[in-house]
Amino acid sequence: MLNNPVEGERYLAEPRAVILAPTRELVMQIGEDARELGKFTGLSTVTLIGGADYAKQLQKVNQRVTDIVVATPGRLIDFLQRRDMFLDRVESLVLDEADRMLDMGFIPQVKRIVRSTPKKEDRQTLLFSATFSPDIMNLASQWTYEPITVEIEPERIATENVDQRVYVLESRDRLNVLKNILATPEATSVIVFANRRDQVRRVHERLQKSGLECGILSGEITQAKRTKTLEQFKSGRLRVLIATDVAGRGIHVDGVSHVVNYDLPEDPEDYVHRIGRTGRAGEKGVSISFASEDNAFLLPEIEALLGQSLKCTQVPVDLVNS
């Protein structure tokens, strides 16, 4: 964009680049990074997410000419339907975590957005995906022009910086073991993942009742609350975060010491995503997964994706006792 400045007059609500991501947290993270990278370039970035005040977002769009829009598909559709934004001048279209958008049912919305941009021959299109299933490849063929495929270290799915541990235990013992893990001095910054919103809520409530201050990230929490919680976790004011996979996808925080899988994920790729929250930026991290009678059958699929066996052990004695 810097190498190809726009000649002539520009108008409000006509971005040069659009970045789509599946979750609000991820949009906010990308927006922060874009603003940081563009700090001294004069490029302006606007983030559009559902669950936030539409009027305030519209006000930001209309304050100045917008270069980059980072958005969730649904909220960008809102702007297009109300004719508060136009994509006919888009030069670059970025689709982040396309596989997740496919899983979450966003593809019909994404297709509408893509149709609002110039023809694929007249724009740059970048599609990022953790996996390249036939469905993703089909979308790539529809949306890209003479694409180049870049695959980054496919054989190294799990980072070498993460010490992966699997504790075999009864489901009823998980909370007690979790409390003891959180009480260890090594657990300085911890993300606990559960599969469902109600499970996240229960774990959060029980930890709070036991006197352990922790935050919660799930789809049923208001966007303002989620934003505040994530900021507190990033700053270190909150040491423990309980999250679902969808909400946790926007968590890119250096210094996370532990990831705990309170539930084994039903999708093996979510396991990779979860443990990737620790061991970042060259630091060492620990992932602890609870394998109980309810979910141990999920381990073989995870191991197949990793290309390695996970060492399953009994819970250490010091983590069992109350």
Predicted regions located by residue number:
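Conserved helicase RecA-like core
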Residues: 1-322
